[in-house]
Amino acid sequence: MKKYPEILTVPGCAEWRRTETAPPMTVSSEGIRNGVIEKRFGIFGSDNIAGIPMRSLPFRIENAPAETKTFALTLLDYDAVPVTGFCWIHWIAANLRKPVMPENASADGSGFVQGVNSWGAPFLGEKALHVEAASSYGGMAPPDGQHRYQLTVYALDAELPLEDGFLLNELLNAMAGHVLAAAALSGLYPGTE
């Protein structure tokens, strides 16, 4: 079976079930132009709760395997590690049934489940969002300069047994053995300093 180096793998997931002639799955976003995330999806946008950006990125998945039942996503900031000590979770979602996610779909949240982002982390103390509010998109606000954000989408062969408010580790554990393909897209967002 041909392996596609541009496609990410997830620990514990099944091997890709693609034919050698099938094109790899891809993800694109109208909210990321020339590798830069448009300002309205982060701290410089106008949609926020308690100062936390809430307007979610749109995206489109193409060439998903025919066996795909649902999709899952992660939007992560690995550049947050030097600041916080861990990768910042901006958005996790599962059981998406359509390959197109419109702009600000997280606000409605219908037709899929969303997990807790890092804006609900206990170390934020009184500034932390409650689990309900943090179970959505929480946009970019890099405090130490420009960060790179990675949106990864996963094509799955099953609906995952998750409810709103799940955690990233629960998503990864539920996806194990069900990932048919994955695709990633990254973009930069300017810092607040």
List each model region and its residues.
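N-terminus-centered regions that define maturation/targeting leaders and the start
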Residues: 1-193
